[in-house]
Amino acid sequence: MGNAYIFSLQPTFTQGLILGQFSILFLLVLVLKYLFFDTVSDHAYRTSSYQPKIERDEDEDGIALVAERLAPKPAQDGKQSGNECESADWLNALLIQVLEAYRVKLRDGLPGAEGDEVARKRVERFANQMRPPGFLDPIKVHSVDLGVTAPRLSRARPRPQKAPNTDPAIEFDMSYADTISLSLSTSVLFNYPFASFARLPVSLTISLSHFSSSVLLTPPQPHAQHPTVTLNLPSPGTDFVLNIQTKSLMGSRAKLADVPKLHEMITHQIQRVLLEKGTWKVVLPGLASVSEVKEDVKREQQAGELPVN
């Protein structure tokens, strides 16, 4: 008679080890799913009962004073503060009016809470147009602060030409401190092991503390086929300082507040966007069209002269 396989109800060490691993994994899934994740399928625009806020030490007037302190002071007695450097005060006055015009336009010219609501809806609509639908639930914007000041430019100076045939350019130092902030909530979707397996609710407030950088302004080339004014932020070969505040809340029943890794990720993404998309070309009326300049930019990107945006 051949050897028969005898099944024993007494578990072996290997069976116990495998069963223990599955038990731990099962408990971990339960804890994550029912404490931190949200399993409700109809979650569109569902918000947390708490939206984190940035606690500021300064009010709007205080922020304006901070911006004033951060900006270099103009030279006394009509003297320039450095070799061939100008204060650019006239440009700062123009920049303040330009930004204020955009703020009024975003609010449809409405004051107070009514204008705030118009700006909030516009930012929310733009955010949902840009969000990846398979990764994030619809984004709910709770509040938007468009700020009260403008970047402060100083020390306008010619940029030294590294080669005889390089284009002349003007370099500025820029410093910006304002009340700009954005408060929103959404959910991160988990599509494993099946679609919409779970949702991780996230409430987030992002606020600008201080941003400083150099700015390079390149005038148009008179003999170029499509002359444009080029603005680089930051100036090539230089660094910049970006300080932002974040307040976050993650989870459904059990909540994690102010996760450091989330702050690092947001800061890194903003820095990456500034480096990749920090070049703007201003089309001169009557000398070129936007479509022609876009074709020029594509050719420059293919030739490796510009970063791909």
Swiss-Prot record:
InterPro entries xrefs: Mmm1, MMM1_dom, SMP_LBD
Principal subcellular localization: endoplasmic reticulum
Side of membrane Lumenal, spans: 1-16
All ranges on the Cytoplasmic side of the membrane: 38-309
Keyword Hydrolase in record: no
CDD domains in the cross-refs: SMP_Mmm1
Topology with respect to the bilayer: Single-pass type I membrane protein
Subcellular location: Endoplasmic reticulum membrane
GO CC annotation: endoplasmic reticulum membrane; ERMES complex
Biological process, per Gene Ontology: mitochondrial genome maintenance; mitochondrion-endoplasmic reticulum membrane tethering; phospholipid transport; protein insertion into mitochondrial outer membrane
Record key words, sorted: Endoplasmic reticulum, Lipid transport, Lipid-binding, Membrane, Transmembrane, Transmembrane helix, Transport
Residue intervals of the SMP-LTD domain: 84-293
Residue ranges crossing the lipid bilayer per the database entry: 17-37
Family the UniProt entry places it in: Belongs to the MMM1 family.
Chain's role: Component of the ERMES/MDM complex, which serves as a molecular tether to connect the endoplasmic reticulum (ER) and mitochondria. Components of this complex are involved in the control of mitochondrial shape and protein biogenesis, and function in nonvesicular lipid trafficking between the ER and mitochondria. The MDM12-MMM1 subcomplex functions in the major beta-barrel assembly pathway that is responsible for biogenesis of all outer membrane beta-barrel proteins, and acts in a late step after the SAM complex.
Domain notes: The SMP-LTD domain is a barrel-like domain that can bind various types of glycerophospholipids in its interior and mediate their transfer between two adjacent bilayers.
Subunit architecture: Homodimer. Component of the ER-mitochondria encounter structure (ERMES) or MDM complex, composed of MMM1, MDM10, MDM12 and MDM34. A MMM1 homodimer associates with one molecule of MDM12 on each side in a pairwise head-to-tail manner, and the SMP-LTD domains of MMM1 and MDM12 generate a continuous hydrophobic tunnel for phospholipid trafficking.
The protein's name: Maintenance of mitochondrial morphology protein 1
